[in-house]
């Protein structure tokens, strides 16, 4: 029988976007201090059957990433709620670590999903490159 009074399923949603590190009033980004209350509130919603997290981050601080990851897992365990993560454009390095806090992870086939703790270092020869006419080409796969 149809009823207007049936309880609708609710999903709590957290959006994490930006570089992971010391964020502040005038500095955008993701850090544990700025997300702690938001995460707590999402998991404490009694009507919510699960928590969805949308992440769009190239990574950043490994410490902040790990603090957020651990806190999400702790809150999920305490509340007995599943965590579903949706990677938007990028979930790399620390963003990927936070994504791993999910019980399920979904990503677009065009999303950049990266590994944890990758650092690339190189030398720059910009003047020499200009002088001898070297052209830059980028190839990606995956």
For each predicted feature, which ranges?
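Small-residue-centered hinge/linker elements
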Residues: 1-81, 90-97, 101-142
